[in-house]
Structure formats: C-alpha cells, structure tokens
Amino acid sequence: MLSLIKLQRVFNVHQVPKAFHEDGIISGYRHPRSSATECVWSLFQLTNETLNVWTHFLPTWYFLWKLMTVLLMEDVWNEAYTWPLLVFLFSCCVYPLASSCAHTFSSMSTRARHICYFFDYGALSFYSLGSAISYSAYVFPDAWLSSSFHAYYISVAVFNTVLSTSLACYSRLGLPLLHYSHDIVERFSERQCPRMSKVLRILAFAYPYLFDNIPLFYRLFVCVGEGCTDNEANSVHVQHTLLAFLTSFLFATHLPERLAPGRFDYIGHSHQLFHVCAIIGTHFQMKAIEMDMGLRRSQLLASAPAISFNNTIGAALLCVSVSLGIICVYSLPLLYSSNPKNTANKE
C-alpha cells in the first residue's frame, strides 16, 4: 500500500503563508492549498504534522474501547450513577479525534485551517465539561458534598465551556461579525498579534481547567482531617495533575524547538510532546475517576446530590449545541467573505 502512495512535496517556512507558520519549525510544511485526499495521504509520509495526527488519532480508539466497555458491561439505561463516566469518556473520544482531524486537514487553505481549529477548540472545551461532570459526581471531597459550591459547580462549568470556546476562537480572528464582508486580514488576527493570540488561547483553556480542579486541588493539597477523602485514587490524581501542568508548560513555551529551530521539525517538537503528555494524563485521570467511582459508590449515593439527566447528559448536549453555534458564527465570515483568493494570498 505504501508503495502506491504519492509522496507530497514539503516546504520550508519561507515558502508557505505566515498563517501556517509554527514557532521554531523551519521545514516539513505541507502545501497550503492541499486537497482533502492529499491531506490524508500526507499522514503516511513524514511532515511536521504527521506525528501530531497519529499521537491523537490512535488513542481515540483506546478511549472509544473504554467507552464501549462501559456501555456493554453496565446497565447504563437504568443506572444514573454511570452517566457522568459516560459523558467523560465520550469527551475523551471527541477531543483527540477533533485534534487529529484538525491537524490532518488544516493545510487545505487558510480558511480551512481556522475552521478546523475552531472545532478543535470546541472539543477541548467539551472535554473540560466532561471532566467537571465526572468530578462533581465522583471526585468532590466529602467535606464539600452538597455544599453551595457543589450545587452551582456544573452550571459554572457549562458557562466556562461556552466562554472557553468563544475566547479560543476569538484568539484566531477576533470578533466574527466585525467587517463581515471584508477580507480576514482587515480584522484582528493571530498573524497580526501572535503573542496576544497565544495568551488568550492559554487563558481560554487554563481557566476552565483550574476551575474544574478546585475540588481536587483542595482534596489533594489543602484539606486535612476528616472529610478529605484520602483513598488510593489520590496518588493517581496527583500523576494526572503533574502531567496536566507539564502539558500546559509544553504548549506555552514551544520547547525544545525554540532553543534549536529546525532540529525538531519532524520528531520531538513541543506539540507532539504536548499531545503525548495530554493523552497519558487523560489516561491517569480516567483511571483515578474510575477508582473514586468504585471506592466511594455507597457514600456518594447516600450523601451526594442525586445524579440526573440535566446535570450530566443534558449539560453535555447543551454545551455541544452552544459550542457548535459559536463555531458556526465564527466560521460564516470565513466562508462568505469577499475575494477569497486575495484573502488566502494575504494570509
């Protein structure tokens, strides 16, 4: 099969539009006007995006297997206690799949690149909500069960998801309806303000993560005495937390390629490492959640607020609907703005 694949030409950073540039990456860029077929074939040759795709596409199947196992082994239709885990596992399938698709098809055009990453951001925001829903059901420390914070936790997490998707999309192109019929380049763009775009994007995902983990951080690092939920899952939660901060560090710093531009273009650059750390961290997060779910089942069913459709699947459906609406609002100006060829050339 590989012998039938026509290898695509790769380009250096000076041969592609600035919208496609990555910090510290000098070579290995695909053609910025690739067809969908060429994008797929490019996954079977080494470019600076190849491992970005595979490091998320392959783990998607692992998380899908975990999801299907729960669906087949548990009485999910009648057992509401499993619903938060289902939402979390589904979000674990969605975010790496959306990421791998974004990295695959982002070289079709400037517009396609933006839209692909809009969906990527929406999927990451949905994953943050999936984490919050599972934390509310299984991870909250005993001392905080049925507290006022617990009562509003999911509602705030839903709002954070909407805010995260909006801010992340804004970080690429600014307000979506500003200069609706004008070229993209006339609006705020990542190309014009790369540092501000990076700060906004980090904020868009750091804030929901920090909020989601308030009960976990309190449980692990602050709480002493009774009501602190000290069990075997805590050490696994710590592993996930360390990997989450390492993931954030790699995403924010672009190390090691910033120290040696061109050395890590194909293998070993920060985005690949960031993907690997994120997936391993998600694995430990899933393991810790499943441990808490089993170890604390009787206590949570007796003391925690009742798990309902509204605070699990309903919240997830609302998040998906609103995020898709936000993505559409940000994407429409790209699809209908004037002079598409000129816009692509300027970008």
Curated annotation (Swiss-Prot):
Instruction: Name any Gene Ontology BP term.
Output: oogenesis
- Coiled-coil features, chain-numbered ranges: none
**Which key words are in the record?**
Developmental protein, Differentiation, Lipid-binding, Membrane, Oogenesis, Receptor, Steroid-binding, Transmembrane, Transmembrane helix
Ranges per topology, Cytoplasmic: 1-52, 103-114, 160-201, 257-314
Q: Mark the transmembrane ranges.
A: 53-73, 82-102, 115-135, 139-159, 202-222, 236-256, 315-335
Q: Is Transmembrane helix among the key words of this record?
A: yes
Query: What is the recorded membrane topology of this protein?
Result: Multi-pass membrane protein
An annotated GO cellular component? membrane
* Subcellular location, principal: membrane
Q: Where in the cell is it found?
A: Membrane
Extracellular topology: which positions?
Answer: 74-81, 136-138, 223-235, 336-347
Q: Which InterPro entries match?
A: AdipoR/HlyIII-related
Q: Give the Gene Ontology MF terms in alphabetical order.
A: signaling receptor activity; steroid binding
Q: Which Pfam families match?
A: HlyIII (PF03006)
Source organism superkingdom: Eukaryota
The keyword Membrane belongs to this UniProt entry's keyword annotation: yes
Identify its protein family: Belongs to the ADIPOR family.
As for what it does, the entry says: Steroid membrane receptor. Binds progesterone. May be involved in oocyte maturation.
Q: What is this protein called?
A: Membrane progestin receptor gamma-B
* Gene (UniProt): paqr5b
